[in-house]
Amino acid sequence: MNRESDWLWVEPIMGSRRVSNFCWAAILLFGALGFFFVGISSYFGKDLIPFLSSQQILFVPQGVVMCFYGIAGLFLSFYLWCTIFWNVGSGYNKFDKKKKIVSLFRWGFPGENRRICINFFMKDIQGIRMEVQEGIYPRRTLYMKIKGQQDIPLTRIRENLTLGEIEEKAAELARFLRVSIEGL
C-alpha cells in the first residue's frame, strides 16, 4: 500500500494492463489469423501464407469451420485488446482521515458508467476481513466490512499474495483506519 501521510492513504489498483493479458491477446490474435487464412486459402485453392499449408483441407466443411473459428478468435482478441487499451479495472482506493471519507475508484468500459466511484464515511467501516482458502488454487482476499452493505473486496481475485503479505496489508490498513481484523 502506498501511504502518503498520516491522514491520507492512496492505494493504486492495477487494471487489465498486465503482461499475461498482453500475451493472451497476442497469442489469440495470431492463432485466429492463422485459422482464418488457412480457411480462406482452402477456398481459393492456393496458400495465401506460404508456411500455412491448406492443400489437403476441403473448403466445405473444414475450411468453413476454420474461418468460423478464426473470426470468433478475432472477436475475442479484439475484446481483450480493447480492455487493455481502456485499462478496465484500474483505479485506486483512497482513505482520507481529514474528510473522513473512503473513495474506491475504478475505470470501466466506455459508456455512461465508465467511471465507477464508491464513496462512504469512515464511521461506517466495521472492520477488515481476510478470506483465505488454501488448496490447488489458493485464494487470499481482503474485504472491508461496511454497515448495512455487503463486504467490499480491496484486493483483486487473481492477486497472488502470500499469507504473510495479506496479513501485513490487513494489519497496516486496520491500524490506519483504527478498526479490527476478522478472518483467518
UniProtKB/Swiss-Prot annotation:
Q: Which GO terms describe its cellular component?
A: chloroplast thylakoid membrane; photosystem I
Q: Which InterPro entries match?
A: PSI_Ycf4_assembly
Q: Where are the transmembrane segments?
A: 21-43, 68-90
Q: Does the keyword DNA damage apply?
A: no
Keyword set, alphabetical order: Chloroplast, Membrane, Photosynthesis, Plastid, Thylakoid, Transmembrane, Transmembrane helix
Name where it's found: Plastid, Chloroplast thylakoid membrane
Main location, first listed in the record: plastid
Its membrane topology = Multi-pass membrane protein
Annotated GO biological process: photosynthesis
Regarding protein family, the annotation reads: Belongs to the Ycf4 family.
The protein's job, in short, is: Seems to be required for the assembly of the photosystem I complex.
The record's NCBIfam families line, in alphabetical order, gives: PRK02542.1
This chain belongs to the protein called Photosystem I assembly protein Ycf4
Report the source organism. Physcomitrium patens (Spreading-leaved earth moss)
Upper lineage is:
Eukaryota, Viridiplantae, Streptophyta, Embryophyta, Bryophyta
Gene behind this protein? ycf4
